[in-house]
Amino acid sequence: MQAELVIKNGLVILETGEVITDVAVQGGKIVAIGQDLSGERVIDATGLVVSPGMVDAHVHITDPGGGYRDEWEGYVTGTAACAKGGVTTFMEMPLNQIPATVDKTSLEIKYKAGENKLKVDVGSFGGVVPTNLADGIQELDEGGVSGYKCFLGTCGDRSIEGDFQNVDDYSLYEGMKQVAKTGKVLAIHAENAPITDKLGAVAYQNGETTLAAYVATRPVFTEVEAIQKAILFAKETGCRIHICHVACQEGVEEVLKAQAEGVDVTCETCTHYLYFTTDELDAIGPVVKCSPPIRDADQQAALWNHVQTGGIAFVTSDHSPCTPDLKDTTNAFEAWGGISGVQNNVDVLFDEAVQKRGLSLKQFADMIAANPADRYHLAQKGRISIGKDADFVLIKPNAPYILKAEDLEYRNKISPYIGREIGAQVIQTILRGETIYAQETGVTEAFNGVFIKN
């Protein structure tokens, strides 16, 4: 019997390691792995690495924009960038869309905004904020979110009704108790708000303008203290937690220490922390501003070590786009803090991790797909194995190219990777057996993606 699709002769990353073999797909699922399989459609992957499609566990899509952020990043452009970049599934953050996703009503608004606009599959985070502790967390659970998100650092615009808010200590404690009852994971932006806010205000008042000065207002200890607090509260409440975008080795070490004590905690870092360092930020400009900030070369080397040894569970983009005017300033303190990166996870990470640092292909696939899928219970995602969704990214190794602005599918062609030579290329992306991007034909016109509801 012929399968609907067979991917032939690729170097396929399996649970047991990589092997040159064929993969057969029927009804959007992987149905066979082996030699000499036959299919109605055949993709010749000779010379290519066949990886599970990336599961990017940290992406912001600003849809709906609520009249405030309508030009930031919608589902159409954001998911097109995912397709071109080899991301077949992402976890969408509950901000910066208006309204923020914090209860049944706002979750339904978000689902409605994405109807017939998704080129990839999307899991959802619900927010934990001071205003949704009555019943919002339970409503989000019933509405199918795959996890929750809160901010310890300051976030949101208080002048915009319905924008996201960071938690105070009581809201964190009470929110964790409620999330614990759902059994789902609370992802945490861990920075000390009072100290970073004050240091930033003082630096701005003193006339500081550089990105180096901005980094100095968010010192390592402000990240570590917030991680320690989150872990302490997790011990008290039994809440499963995940620390987002860790930018320092000391933060990872706190997570590892807590794991050894039996706490259900994991952490991620982001592609940009593994690629850029503080000393080059001002030459690049505000396009590379984010929080926590990009730290020095020693911190980057330590993060890479934790990636290689598994202390960092997975790597994300923290794709946080905005309009060009919010980056067009000579004062780093006035610029929007967020990096557009979802289109250049797979190629940059393959080059930096596998080709330059010798990470195994199995480790690569775990880092971009299996581990995030497991953490957020995306049961059909993350692995090339029989019965899983047929989600693949085909990668051409040792194929350098220079990224140009016109290559980007984002609504706003902003990225710190523009002009950089990237040493691998995404050749094709497949979602549940359907090609959603091919290098020779571009991104599909179809909207085959769905919201995953847990």
Swiss-Prot record:
Its cofactor is Zn(2+). One of its GO terms (biological process) is allantoin catabolic process. One of its GO terms (molecular function) is zinc ion binding. Pathway: Nitrogen metabolism; (S)-allantoin degradation; allantoate from (S)-allantoin: step 1/1. Pfam families: Amidohydro_1 (PF01979). Keywords: Hydrolase, Metal-binding, Purine metabolism, Zinc. Zn(2+) 2 binds at K149, H189, H245. Carboxylation allows a single lysine to coordinate two zinc ions. It is an enzyme of class 3 (hydrolase). Binds 2 Zn(2+) ions per subunit. GO terms for cellular component: cytoplasm. It catalyses: (S)-allantoin + H2O = allantoate + H(+). The modification N6-carboxylysine is found at K149. Catalyzes the conversion of allantoin (5-ureidohydantoin) to allantoic acid by hydrolytic cleavage of the five-member hydantoin ring. Belongs to the metallo-dependent hydrolases superfamily. Allantoinase family. NCBIfam families: allantoinase (TIGR03178), PRK08044.1 (NF005960). This is Allantoinase. It comes from Enterococcus faecalis (strain ATCC 700802 / V583).
